[in-house]
C-alpha cells in the first residue's frame, strides 16, 4: 500500500515537471542563482559533496509561490555554478512528518546519502505553538531516490518543548554529533532560544549531551532571541564556529535590521564543551540573507549558501509562479576573529565579454555606461586617500525613468550604502556596512535579474563584508553610472563582465 507521503511526492513531482518552461518568460528569473522550477523556496538543506557531485536540497512548496507544507527540493552540480533540478527528495504526509519535512542536513554514511530532517506535526490550528517536532531520517544509495526511515530523535532536551528543529550532524572520531535548535517557554517573553548537543554511534540512537549554548547564557544577544534556527557547528582556521539564525532580536543602530538574523559566535571546542569567545556577529548586511548552511567542497574549502530572501519582504515574482532563490556559493575564511566571505572562484566560468577602464576621476560629475545584459559581474577599486567626495559610487539597473539601485560610499557616515528605494517593484529600504579603514576599497558585485550581491574588501583582504539584497527592476533597466557628489572621486579600476546564463531551469536527465 502506498504511503500518504509517496502520493504527495508524485503530486509534487508532477507540479515541478509541468512548470519548468513557463519560467523562461519570467523577467526576474535568475540566471545563476539556484531557484525553484515552480512554487516556493526557502532554507537550503543537506548541502554535501557526494560521489563526485554537489547536492543542494531546500525547503520547497511546489504547488504555489507561498509557504506551505514543506517538501525537500533537490538540485545537483559538478562545478557549483551549473545546477540541475532533480526529483523532489522528500514529501510530507507520514505520521512523523504529516505537516512538513522541515530543515536538516545530509551526511555520507559509508556511501549511503543520509538525510536528517525535522518532522513537523500541527496539533491544533489555534496556536503556532501547538506543534510537535521530531528528528527523522531518510536514506538513498543513488543520491536521488530516498527511503524514509522514520523518527531517530523524539524527545527534546526538556519536557513541553514544542519548537525543536533543524538538525545538523557531523562525525568526529568515532562518534556522530548533532546540534539542533529548540525553544523553552518564558512567561515574560515569547520564549528563549537554545542549541542542544546530542551524540550517537549509529545515526539512529541519540543521547542528549547538554545544551551547547542558549540565550540565557552570558551572551550579548539582548537575551530575547526566542528561537535559534538552523544551527551549524564547524571548525574554521583555529577556531570553532557556532552559526545560527536567531529570531526575536531587536534592531539596534545598524544591527539586526531584518526581521530575523543570521550570524555566528566563535569559540573553543573540547568535546562536549563549547566556550564562546566572541559576541554574536551577523554574516551579511543586506535585506535578504537567512538560514545559511555550510559544507566542505571536494578540495577542503568551506562553502556557504543562504536563502536569498527574508520572511517579511515583498516577493514580486509570485505573479510568475515562483518565489525565493539561493545566494551565490561563498568561500569562508577566518581573518582576525571574523568570518570573511568571497564568491567561489568557479563563478569565473560564466564570464564572457570584458570591459576595463583603468582610472576614472570625477568631480561633481557622472560617468555613464550601458550593460549588455542584466547578468553582470563588476570589480571596482575606489581610492579613499585621493578622494574627498561626500558620496561616491555607482547607480545600477537604471532605466532613465527614475529606476535605479544605488551603491555608494558615504564619508559622513563612514559606511557603504545600498539604497534600493527605486530598485523596481515592491522593494524599498537601505542597508549598509562599515567602510573599511584602508586607503583603497574594493567592491566585487554580482547582478542577476532580481538580485545584487556585494563583497567589500580593503587593500589586503577581499570579502570583509557582504551586502545581499533582492531587486526587481524592469528588464530594460540596463544603464549605469559612476558618480561623485560634493567633491572628487578617483576610481583606480573599473572592470565589468557580462555573465553567461547558467540555464538553471534545466531538468536533470537523471530524473527520468
Curated annotation (Swiss-Prot):
Record flagged with keyword Glycoprotein: no
Pathway the protein contributes to: Glycan biosynthesis; sucrose metabolism
Annotated substrate binding sites: 40-43, 59, 67, 102-103, 165-166, 229, 311
UniProt protein name: Sucrose-6-phosphate hydrolase
Membrane recorded as keyword: no
GO MF annotation list: beta-fructofuranosidase activity
Catalysed conversion reaction: Hydrolysis of terminal non-reducing beta-D-fructofuranoside residues in beta-D-fructofuranosides
Enzyme Commission (EC) number: 3.2.1.26
Cellular component per GO, a single term: cytoplasm
N-terminal signal peptide: none
Organism placement in taxonomy: Bacteria, Pseudomonadati, Pseudomonadota, Alphaproteobacteria, Sphingomonadales
Active site residues per record: 43
